[in-house]
Amino acid sequence: MPTVTLNRIPINYVVTGSGPRVLLIMGAGSPGRVWNTYQVPALVKAGFEVVTMDNRGITNTVGIEGMSIADLAADAAALIEHLGGPAHVIGTSLGSRVVQELAITRPELVVKAIMLATTGKPYPVESALNRGQQALHHAGIDLPPAYTAAVNVLLNLSPQTLADPQKAQEWLDIFEYSAPTTTSPGIRAQTAMDRSRDRLSDLATILAPTLVVGFGDDRMTPPTQGIEVAAAIPGARYQQIEHCGHFGYLEKPDAVNALLIAFLHGHPLPTRL
């Protein structure tokens, strides 16, 4: 994985494929390689150069003190400039808020913007979870990976997925296997970032063609949050994928990828998802 120093911090990134550039920005606590299972292969096959990156705090502790969404957006902007110019930008969860910030502050770098599982203002459930995680961190408590996996599955997946015991166990195994035994300082810093600002009024300044994708069973950022974001951005489109939760890009990858590719190519968006 190449590493480049930008904004005085090392940034890990990977470039795959060729064609119009697409930068994928992951959510809190997850490395860029999470996109590799489904989105990267589909976008490369569709004729795009795909860039994934590790957000500040994922792989090292440089520059994490007092870090903000604006810092993550500045890192993404610096990487786009390093690679030679504007890009389509896609983000999920925290990554979608980074996309918002990037589209507001550096519009010349964003060709099209896609926001998955997004919100433009604080949401009480997410805020309460972040406060709880910070309290555990300050107390020096790391929960057992099996318990963390169960909580993540319940919070981020659809009841329809979990209704199948075999699928539920598969997801539990995946989450437990990938869960760190201790939470790194960088991920703690991501959790502690200020998300209290209501950004809805600022979204009206976004110039890039924008697609907002909501997931019908998302408990972390309910679809109503995404609908608000789309309504706030001039000309933005909103599409909803049912029977998937906050990790809809993993639960319903074919439906998500169909939307991404159609929007980026300028084709009509699929309606049967």
Locate the predicted segments by residue:
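Active-site loop/oxyanion-hole signature of alpha/beta-hydrolase fold enzymes
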Residues: 51-90
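Acidic catalytic loop of the alpha/beta-hydrolase fold
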Residues: 217-221
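Catalytic active-site module of serine/aspartate enzymes centered on a nucleophile-bearing elbow/loop
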Residues: 236-273
